[in-house]
Amino acid sequence: MRHIASLIAMGSPFFRFKRFTVWHDRCAMKVGTDGVLLGAWCELPEVETQCMHVLDIGTGSGLIALMLAQRLEQNRQRFKIYAIDIEPSAVEQSRINFEQSPWALHLSAKNSSMQEFYDDEGFDLIVSNPPYFQNSLKNPDKSRATARHTDTLTYAELLAHAKRLLKSDGRLSLILPIEAETEILKLAKINKLTPTHITY
């Protein structure tokens, strides 16, 4: 992970992976360790014959969606990944990154909140590196504050809407601060979501 930290410290406007490049100069949240870990770690459900539907909530630069596209292609899985974000600049950034990737036909970005997003088919997998600060001092940059604070997407809303959007056998993969574990497990139970893997 030293390579990621050094690129961010130098203020690089992009991060280059093996098969794609992520530009992050227009969005509030830059490429970081959390997103890279979630993109590499989240378990891909086994979906036979049909096309796997994936939703990336709060996509930012589109990093996680791109990592999942690469993994799904390697698995020879048919897929469609939808990426949503409430910040128009992040959506524009992710669209650019998607269009320049080898999976442009499988990726789409939309300016939408999770609360307002609907899809008739439901999703096999929902991923998110959600806002994580609660009741703490906010960054003066409004876009960065939105990306980092739970005001626009609380954990309760995140899990309730994930339940609404998931297929009956779908999976939700999140990366969260350890302090949120008790609350998340409680909300998972309320929403009838069963934890299968917790990694520290």
Residue ranges and their predicted role:
Residues R2-A9, P195-Y200:
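Accessory (non-catalytic) regions of SAM-dependent nucleic-acid methyltransferases
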Residues I4-E46:
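Class I SAM-dependent transferase core
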Residues R19, C51, R78, A104-H106, ...:
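A generic structural signal for alpha->beta connector loops
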Residues W23, Y82, S108-K110, T196-T199:
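General small-molecule cofactor/ligand-binding pocket signal
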Residues C27, V31, L153-Y200:
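Conserved Class I SAM-dependent methyltransferase catalytic core
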Residues A40-D119, L125-S128, Q134-N139:
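Conserved SAM/SAH cofactor-binding pocket of Class I
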Residues P130-E157, H161:
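Mobile active-site "lid"/loop adjacent to the S-adenosyl-L-methionine
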